[in-house]
Design a protein with these regions (language model features):
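An N-terminal assembly and electron-transfer interface module characteristic of large anaerobic redox
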Residues: 2-249
Length: 249
C-alpha cells in the first residue's frame, strides 16, 4: 500500500479489551485467533477509509488453507454490515487460476493504480518480505548455538508474535533462562518438503510448514511447545499426530 502512495493504519497491539470485543462479534465456535481478528477490525472503526481483509483459498491443490482464511472477508463484511467500516479484498486461489501476484495486482488496479505500478509494488513488497524472512531464519539458527536449554515454540506466526497470547510465552521461556526458537524461521518450500518425513497426508499448507519446522529443528532443541489457538480444527488433529510421531525420536 505504501508503494502505491496509500497511507496504512495498523490496529493496536492485542489486549484484553480488544479480545473481549472480538469475542462479542464472533461465534463461540470460532478459534481464538478469529476472535482476535474481529477485535482488531472493531478497533479500526472510524480510523481508516477501509480495512484490508484478503480472501485466501489455496496455493494450489497441495496448498489448501484453513477455511477461516477463505471466509474471513465475507464474515467481516457481514459481521460489521451495520458499522461505519468499509472493506477491500483480493482473492488468492490458484485452483481458480488466480495466483497471489495476480490477486494483488488486481487489488492495486482497483485502488486506482496502473497495472505496471501495482506489479512493481507487489514485487518490491515480496522482495522485502523475502529479505526479512531470510534475516529471521539466520537469527533463529544462530540461537541454536547458545549453550542454554532451547525450546522450539511451534505455532502460526499470527499467534507466536501476538502481544497478548504468544509473546508472553516467548518472554516466559527467556525469563527461565532458556532460549525460545520460533517455528516460522524456515524456508517455507523446504519446510513443506521436510514435512513429508513426519506425515505425507496433511492437507493444510500452514500445518505442513509447522511439521517442516519440527523436522528441521527437533534434533537441535531440548523440548517443543505446541502453541494452539483453541479450538483450531487443523491444529487439534495435527498436534496429536505430532506428539505420537515425535515423542520417541
Amino acid at each position: 500500500f505504501q508503494e502505491l502512495g496509500i497511507e496504512t493504519v495498523i490496529s493496536p497491539h492485542t489486549n484484553k479489551t480488544l479480545m473481549d470485543a472480538g469475542s462479542h462479534y464472533a461465534i463461540d465456535e470460532n478459534c481464538l485467533s478469529s476472535k482476535l481478528f474481529f477485535g482488531h477490525v472493531s478497533a479500526l472503526e472510524g480510523k481508516c477509509d477501509a480495512v484490508f481483509v484478503p480472501r485466501i483459498a489455496n496455493y494450489g491443490k497441495d496448498g489448501v488453507m484453513c477455511s477461516r482464511f477463505e471466509g474471513l472477508y465475507d464474515m467481516a463484511v457481514n459481521t460489521f454490515r451495520d458499522h461505519d467500516i468499509d472493506f477491500v479484498t483480493c482473492n488468492v486461489d490458484i485452483q481458480q487460476k488466480c495466483p497471489e501476484e495476480q490477486a494483488y495486482i488486481m487489488l492495486g488496479v482497483s485502488l486506482g493504480a496502473s497495472e505496471a505500478k501495482a506489479r512493481e509494488a507487489y514485487q518490491k513488497s515480496y522482495q522485502a518480505w523475502q529479505a526479512a524472512q531470510k534475516a529471521h531464519i539466520a537469527e533463529e539458527e544462530a540461537r541454536l548455538h547458545d549453550d542454554r536449554i532451547k525450546i522450539l515454540v511451534v505455532g502460526h506466526s499470527y499467534n507466536l508474535y501476538d502481544e497478548y497470547i504468544g509473546k508472553p510465552i516467548l518472554k516466559g521461556i527467556e525469563q527461565l533462562d532458556a532460549v525460545p526458537i520460533c517455528s516460522d524461521a524456515v524456508d517455507l518450500k523446504q519446510a513443506q518438503e521436510d514435512s513429508l518425513n513426519i506425515c505425507k497426508s496433511v492437507p493444510w499448507i500452514m500445518s505442513r510448514e509447522l511439521l517442516g519446522s519440527i523436522a528441521k529443528y527437533h534434533n537441535d532443541v531440548d523440548g517443543i511447545i505446541l502453541l494452539t489457538a483453541f479450538p483450531c480444527g487443523p491444529d487439534s488433529m495435527i498436534n496429536e499426530m505430532i506428539i505420537r510421531r515425535i515423542k520417541d525420536r
